Amino acid sequence: MADFYDTLGVNRNADADSLKRAYRRLARQYHPDINKEAGAEERFKEIGRAYEVLGDPEKRARYDQFGEAGLGGSAGMPDMGDMGGFADIFETFFSGFGGPGSSGARTQRRGPQQGDDLRYDLTIDFNQAVFGQEREIKIPHLETCDVCRGTGAKPGTGPTTCSTCGGAGQVRRATRTPFGSFTQVSDCPTCSGSGQVISDSCQSCGGQGVKQVRKKLRINIPAGVDTGTRLRVSGEGNAGPRGGPSGDLYVFLKVKSHARLKRDGLNIHSEVNVSYLQAILGDTIEVDTVDGPTTLQIPSGTQPSAVLILDNKGIPKLGNPVARGNHCISVNIKIPSRLTDDEKILLEKLAIYYSAKGPQNHHHNSGLFSRLFKSNAS
């Protein structure tokens, strides 16, 4: 006899929800009314036996300790009269079936229904994501036929009640299962669940009640969006069947990377190169930001890899564009690989000056100075 956990495809530590999900999935797959393959019915019974034990905490504890021997012959197909929460599972499975305790047919689908939602992927520039922009897009979607107004019937005519289902949109058939007799409810094959048939179709839409058209839309992209941001455009999805309301359009954004700027949440990061003299003496330079060229103060004594902050020059907060992040600028100090004779003389004098100030400054040929005093020879 197969292990009950293996039968359900779960590990021995599986919780009640995992067991229930596994059982529902397998019961759907192997139900005799759905799966006509040889052995499906026997497999269905094994699945039922496994869940009947593992779904009961007391029986599961005995099974975990003693195996099937600890069940005392109690493991078997569940009794419909003593199923407890087990019956709820079957009510979920067979929402299209009627049977003991069943409420019967599903909600009918006659009349207008809402149309499907649509997805549109839009790529935008870095600065467009920062500050927002209005963009024009073209989408193909279904619109209600303006000739038949969604009925699908030729003007002057109309749909008639389906003779197969009597307008219910559903048909039933009795089915016997290991759990007793059930009434399976399915869409009517004649009217496809609408409860109505069209004898004389609209020539404009071919009886569909909808037509595919390409439509121009102007999309407002708010400031602060990022890759993965989803914008909802109400009522711009597909038109619903039989004159039903349209679904929605969802625009998914992808933001192009910037050549020099990098986004990190609400902050922007970039780098700037300065000379060793600018780092030592300080300077005022101009840097690129999303707001355009901006003045940046380089403090005297700036160290390599120092990060200077431009407040409120980052990304606006989505939904509250007044609040912005910062622009963080990493400073790269460039050491010249070649010096002119005049530069070398001046720096040598500076090195001598520092050497005279104390022993700690004596080894001027190492570190910064060793990099400055490279030979000018080619």
Swiss-Prot record:
The J domain is necessary and sufficient to stimulate DnaK ATPase activity. Zinc center 1 plays an important role in the autonomous, DnaK-independent chaperone activity of DnaJ. Zinc center 2 is essential for interaction with DnaK and for DnaJ activity. It is found in: Cytoplasm. GO terms for molecular function: ATP binding; heat shock protein binding; unfolded protein binding; zinc ion binding. HAMAP family: DnaJ. Keywords: Chaperone, Cytoplasm, DNA replication, Metal-binding, Repeat, Stress response, Zinc, Zinc-finger. Residues 3-67 form the J domain. Homodimer. GO terms for cellular component: cytoplasm. Binds 2 Zn(2+) ions per monomer. A zinc finger (CR-type) spans 132-214. It holds the Pfam family DnaJ. This is Chaperone protein DnaJ. Belongs to the DnaJ family. CXXCXGXG motif repeats lie at residues 145-152, 162-169, 188-195, 202-209.
